[in-house]
Amino acid sequence: AQWRAEGRTADAELMESLAAQPTAVWFTTAGAAEVRENVRALVSAAKAKGRVPVLVAYFVPYRDCSQWSAGGARSEQEYKEWIDAFAAGIGDEKAVVVVEPDGLALLTSEPWCAIGPDEELVPQRFREINHAVDTLKRGKHTRVYLDAGHSAWQALDDYDAGYGEPRQQLGIVNRLLRGGVTRADGFALNTSNYRFTEDLVRYGTRISKCLYLRTERGAATCPADEELDALPVRKSKMTHFVLDTSRNGRGHYTPGEGETDWCNPPGRGLGERPTADTGVPLVDAFLWIKRPGESDGECQGGPAAGRWWPEQALELAELASPPLR
C-alpha cells in the first residue's frame, strides 16, 4: 500500500504477486504450550481454507552451530517436550512438516562449529531427530521430511577427509538413516538455499537410490554416481523428497572475498512456484520453505536473520525465473 501511495505501482504489483504464493511457516522459539497453540491455530486456519499447511520445526539444541540463526532448546528433554507439543498442535489434521533445517547436514562435529568437540552431542542430535520423526508420524495425516542440506554440501556416504573427525563425519545418506528417514515420508533439500532445481533433482535422486540399495539390497556403501544414475527409478520403493525453490531461480552465487554463497547473495531470483505437480517421479513437491525477503543474517547489508528485508524481496521478484508476472 505504501509503495502504491508513492507511485511505485509496478513494484507494488510484484510484491502482491509474491505475497500470493504459499510459503512455509517456521516455529523457532521456546515454550511448549505456545507452540502447541500456535501450530493448532495455523493448521485450523489452513483447514478452513481447504489448504495443507507447510510447517518448519526449527528448535533443535545448538541450532546452526551458534551462527546467524543460533538458538534452539537448551536440552534434549526441552526439545522433546517442544516437539511433542508441536505434534499435538497438528493432531490428525493434514500438514507437511520439514524437520530441522541443517539438523543433519550441520552436526556439531563440523571442525569449525562454535560449539566445541563434545562427542556426545552428535548421538544426541540423532536421538532428537528420531524423536521428532516418531512423534510427528503419529498424526494420521502428517507428512514428515527430514532436512538434508543441498547438492553442494555433504557427499552421499563418505566424509571429506579434510572436513572434520572421521568417526563423527558421516555422508548424508548415513545421516539420514541414523536420523530415521525410513520412518518418515522422505527428505527436504535446499531449505533457505539457492541451488538450481536440476542439480537438486540429480543429487536427491542419487540419495534416494543409495538409500534403496542400502535398505533393500544390503549394500554397505553407495556406488559411484555413474552407477546410481544408471539405476532405474522405482517410485514406489525409493524415498521421495521435496525441494525449496523459493530463491533458486538464478542458482547459487559465486562469492567474492569476505562473502559467502548462502548469506543474502545479491542478484538471486524466485524459483519455481509451489506445486505438487513436479513432473519428477521422486519429487513430491516444490515448496517455498524459506520466505522470500526474509534476511539470512547480518551480511550484504541485510538485517538480522529472519527479519523482513523489502529491498531483497523486490530484487528476488524482479529476477524471478520463471517470471513472477
Question: Where are the regions that the model predicts?
Answer:
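N-terminal carbohydrate-binding/catalytic regions of secreted carbohydrate-active enzymes
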Residues: 1-89, 291-323
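Generic low-polarity alpha-helical segments
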Residues: 31-34, 66, 73-75, 112, ...
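Generic detector of short, locally flexible boundary/turn motifs and exposed helical patches
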Residues: 17-21, 62-64, 108-111, 250-254
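Second-shell loop/turn segments in exported
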Residues: 25-32, 67-76, 114-123, 148-154, ...
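Structural recognition of the beta-strand scaffold that forms the well-ordered cores
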Residues: 24-28, 52-57, 94-100, 105, ...
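Substrate-binding cleft of extracellular glycoside hydrolase catalytic domains
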Residues: 41-144, 158-183
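Surface-exposed substrate-engagement region within the catalytic domains
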Residues: 2-14, 154-310
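Solvent-exposed, charged interface segments at domain starts and junctions
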Residues: 16-25, 31-33, 141-153, 159-169
